[in-house]
């Protein structure tokens, strides 16, 4: 989604890692 792209672009790799962890917690992956 646009949130992942925007967060990754604005905040950097740590944002992507955090987002990925969030998805794993909720089983979205």
Swiss-Prot record:
Q: Which family does it belong to?
A: Belongs to the galanin family.
- Gene name linked to the record: GAL
Mention one GO molecular function.
galanin receptor binding
Q: What is this protein called?
A: Galanin
Q: Where in the cell is the protein located? A: Secreted
Q: Which residues carry this modification: Alanine amide?
A: 29
Lineage in the entry?
A: Eukaryota, Metazoa, Chordata, Craniata, Vertebrata
PROSITE patterns assigned to the protein according to its UniProt record, in alphabetical order: GALANIN
- GO BP, sorted A to Z: neuropeptide signaling pathway
What the protein does comes down to: Contracts smooth muscle of the gastrointestinal and genitourinary tract, regulates growth hormone release, modulates insulin release, and may be involved in the control of adrenal secretion.
How is this protein annotated for GO cellular component? extracellular space; secretory granule
Task: List the source organism.
Answer: Alligator mississippiensis
Keywords in alphabetical order: Amidation, Hormone, Neuropeptide, Secreted
